Regions:
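Conserved C-terminal structural/oligomerization subdomain of aldehyde/semialdehyde dehydrogenase
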Residues: 20-150
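Short secondary-structure junctions
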Residues: 6-16
Length: 150
């Protein structure tokens, strides 16, 4: 939250929740941050917390460029009524899980147990998704053996 307050404006949340259940640990209320520069860590890193950094962009192209500028690519989403915008987003965004108009469920965008889940770039496992057909191979040591009897 210090970074959000330093580089932008905390529009909503940003505090530690009240109550005994939150006494120990690193809990934070759902938070919306605006006004941070697009080069801020708030747009460049993955924060596994309920934090949303909002930036104003002039076009879908600028939004996709901003999303792809991060070295991470776990999940990305778009809300649109225009099918051509969703299609362009799906074709160009560099993330392992992509969704459009998803309003409920997991914040990752994937439906756990139904869809594979994994990131691209420095998110995840080299593009191999959990539940995907090749995911288990990363935990195995492959070996080729040839025996010629003569």
């Amino acid at each position: 939250m210090k970074l959000g307050k330093k580089e932008g404006r905390v529009l909503l949340g940003g505090n530690k929740p009240k109550g005994d259940a939150f006494e120990h640990g690193f809990f934070v209320e759902p938070t919306i941050i605006t006004g941070a520069p697009k080069t801020s860590r708030l747009f460049q890193e993955e924060f596994f917390a309920p934090i949303l950094s909002v930036a104003e962009v002039k076009s879908l192209d600028e939004a996709i460029t901003l999303a792809n500028a991060s070295e991470y690519g776990l999940t990305a989403g778009i809300f649109t009524q225009e099918e051509h915008e969703a299609e362009a987003f799906f074709d160009r965004v560099e993330a392992g899980v992509i969704y459009s108009n998803r309003r409920g469920g997991a914040t990752t965008g994937a439906w756990p147990g139904v869809q594979s889940f994994g990131g691209w770039k420095n998110s995840g496992s080299s593009g191999k998704s959990a539940l995907g057909p090749h995911y288990i191979a990363q935990f195995m040591r492959e070996q080729s053996q040839t025996r010629v009897k003569g």
